[in-house]
Amino acid sequence: KEADNTQHIQKAIDEVGKYALDSEGIRGVVLLKAGRYNVDGTLNLTYDGVILRGEGNCFSDKDSTVLYGRNAAEKAKRLILMGNSSAHNWGNGKGDAQVNIVTQKVMPGDYSFQVEDASAYRAGDLICIKYPTTTAWLEAVWYGGNTKRNTDESKKWKTKDIDISYHRYVTKVEGNMIEVDAPIFYALDVQYAQAYIYKISNPETIRHNVGIENLHISFERSPENSTANVDQNCIYMSSLENSWVKGVSM
């Protein structure tokens, strides 16, 4: 129970990652039998079609699979990375055929909006919808709620800290109206910032059909680090499509 199992599990993940994809986009499953697995590092699920699966999600490792994250006091880390963390550049604000959104306010739940010129876009295009952080927007949200509570500048949100980026597929183009496959979930209001779209030039960096199933995750804790210096992310999901975490308890 004392040994670090990070490399053992990672080796199995890497091995399954070499398998060919089947007709449903799955390579295979890494099955962790019931028991406790100490994880001192980060498990990287970075292959299309690889699933990490346990044999139960109860607290006890007698009849369930328990991933036990250690060294939480020494460093903040990710226990599991799903996807491709290096693919964040799809939302960096740069891409092909950039054009402004002219709809004055795109509301949460909306699937469509008008742009200045949609002639470069077709159904099936992978795009980024970008809403940059501006001083006007930060003032409207009280710099993250901090201006009312304290004057500590270090705690205030800053421009470019939290730009809003949506990863979407174009489903319809009609004139200068563009419809996408999933709704907007934060209002894009032109009075605070100019939203725009562009084509994502590296869609191959997006991972598909990555899963974690049926296991329990726990962390090493002590009275000294029970409320501070804890792991920042238990499961960090980045640049994924059609991927899932189900039957996982913590």
Per-range role (PLM):
Residues 96-99, 105, 118-121, 139-140, ...:
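Ser/Thr/Pro- and often Gln-rich low-complexity regulatory segments
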Residues 32, 51-55, 121-124, 211-212, ...:
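All-beta strand scaffolds that present successive hydrophobic residues in beta-strands
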Residues 118-121, 171-177, 206-209:
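A short, structured loop/turn motif at beta-sheet edges
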Residues 133-167, 171-177, 213-250:
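Right-handed parallel beta-helix
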Residues 2-7, 51-110, 117, 179-195, ...:
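Right-handed parallel beta-helix/beta-spiral solenoid domain characteristic of secreted/periplasmic
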Residues 3-51, 55-74, 119, 132-143, ...:
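N-terminal extracellular ligand-recognition/capping segment immediately after the signal peptide
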Residues 36, 56-58, 128, 216, ...:
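A structural signal for beta-strand register positions
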Residues 121-135, 186-210:
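Extended Gly/Ser/Thr-rich low-complexity repeat segments
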